Amino acid sequence: MIDPSAKIHPSAIIHPNAVIGANVEIGAFTCVEDEVEIGEGTWVGSHVLIKGPTKIGRNNKIFQFSSIGEDCQDKKYAGERTFLEIGDANVIREHCTFHRGTVQDQSLTKVGSRNLFMVNVHVAHDCMIGDDCIFANNATLAGHVHIGDWVIFGGLAAIHQFGRVGSHAFIAGMAALNKDVPPYVMAAGHYATPFGINSEGLRRRGFSAEAISAVKRAYKELYRSGKTIDEVMPVLETMAQDEPAVALFVEFLKKNERGIIRP
């Protein structure tokens, strides 16, 4: 179904079962396949491929030569019905690749809202990405990666499969992540190590001086006290009672399985 207000270039190929919302624009030579839903106000440039089952929200911008909802590159994939969901107001620049999930996980790759994906970013199968993130050119997310909110990935940075990055973390360009990165932490290097707290990012997002100070104390407990994660958890849990910002640390570390980056 195509909304009458949609603007579709005559050379675009739209499957009869695709759902195209109000005021959607689709450029030349773009192909929208079966079981694709594109929400109101989304703009799709030329030469884009969108395969289903894929649901794209409202007011997104998808630039030329991107591949959205393609089969994953997991060798175990055998054609099962899996999904991709993209939220609202994302910007997906040229040559980005977003793959659907696998039945070995939740059969779903999910992207939140208001994210910026610069040129040639790869989002592999079963990734879960929050809101308000920035991924610079050629950032690469392997399968099953979980990214929180307000994360910044530098150009050419890459993360190992099943890796996690907590909200408000900053990943430097060309960093290689083989362990989890806790919330608020800046990471750089190959393999990446921690370089303090993303204080400037927190200030820009309206965190109070007291909250930032508490996050810094939590970072020191985690990385400079000489304690194991099990030993430091009671300290962080006590801190979180007085400062909610520290609770992100606690919740993230409770789910730790792969270990966290270390100096």
Curated annotation (Swiss-Prot):
Annotated coiled-coil segments of the chain: none
InterPro entries: Acetyltransf_C, Acetyltransf_C_sf, Hexapep, Lipid_A_LpxA, Trimer_LpxA-like_sf
Any one GO molecular function term: acyl-[acyl-carrier-protein]-UDP-N-acetylglucosamine O-acyltransferase activity
GO BP terms: lipid A biosynthetic process
Reactions catalysed: a (3R)-hydroxyacyl-[ACP] + UDP-N-acetyl-alpha-D-glucosamine = a UDP-3-O-[(3R)-3-hydroxyacyl]-N-acetyl-alpha-D-glucosamine + holo-[ACP]
TM helices/strands, residue ranges: none
Enzyme Commission identifier(s): 2.3.1.129
Domain of life: Bacteria
GO-annotated cellular components: cytoplasm; membrane
Known pathway: Glycolipid biosynthesis; lipid IV(A) biosynthesis; lipid IV(A) from (3R)-3-hydroxytetradecanoyl-[acyl-carrier-protein] and UDP-N-acetyl-alpha-D-glucosamine: step 1/6
Locations listed in the record: Cytoplasm
Keywords: Acyltransferase, Cytoplasm, Lipid A biosynthesis, Lipid biosynthesis, Lipid metabolism, Repeat, Transferase
UniProt xrefs under Pfam families: Acetyltransf_11 (PF13720), Hexapep (PF00132)
Record's function text: Involved in the biosynthesis of lipid A, a phosphorylated glycolipid that anchors the lipopolysaccharide to the outer membrane of the cell.
Subunit structure: Homotrimer.
Family: Belongs to the transferase hexapeptide repeat family. LpxA subfamily.
Entry protein name: Acyl-[acyl-carrier-protein]--UDP-N-acetylglucosamine O-acyltransferase
Species annotation: Tolumonas auensis (strain DSM 9187 / NBRC 110442 / TA 4)
